[in-house]
């Protein structure tokens, strides 16, 4: 939503959410590249955090190494003000600045398998929140 340009997109989304009284079950940000999964950061109640932590074995096939408190991402941060649980998907960041904001930051550089694993983690989180709740 553009944290690189002052976060105006995230703030506008938050203002629209409040204005229209939109309900969010959760917000998830993925803003560190399309690399293989490493972990999930979560900002919510301790009870919800423990529930997500209990799902770790279900995320093991995607190579998720940790689920930690804190570190959701700048674009969704405003939503915390209205009680929305926030999550950040954290991929392996070793190659991030090899591509990010460079001429090489193109879709053909993405490793298909890494992107599939990352999508699997995000899709699984959505499914688990939907079926098991917070």
Whereabouts are the PLM-identified features?
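Active-site-adjacent substrate-binding region
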Residues: 35-134
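Acidic/histidine-rich catalytic neighborhood of metal-dependent amide-processing enzymes
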Residues: 1-52
């Amino acid at each position: 939503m553009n944290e690189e340009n002052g976060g105006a997109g995230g703030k506008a989304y938050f203002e629209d959410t409040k204005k229209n009284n939109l309900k969010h079950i959760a917000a998830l940000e993925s803003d560190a590249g399309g690399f293989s999964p490493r972990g999930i950061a979560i900002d919510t109640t301790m009870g919800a955090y423990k529930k997500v932590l209990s799902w770790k074995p279900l995320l093991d096939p995607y190579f998720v190494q940790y689920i930690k408190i804190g570190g959701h991402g700048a674009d969704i941060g405003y939503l915390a003000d209205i009680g929305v649980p926030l999550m950040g998907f954290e991929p392996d960041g070793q190659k991030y600045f090899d591509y990010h904001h460079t001429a090489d930051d193109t879709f053909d550089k993405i490793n298909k398998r890494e992107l599939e694993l990352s999508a699997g983690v995000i899709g699984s989180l959505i499914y688990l929140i939907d079926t098991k709740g917070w």
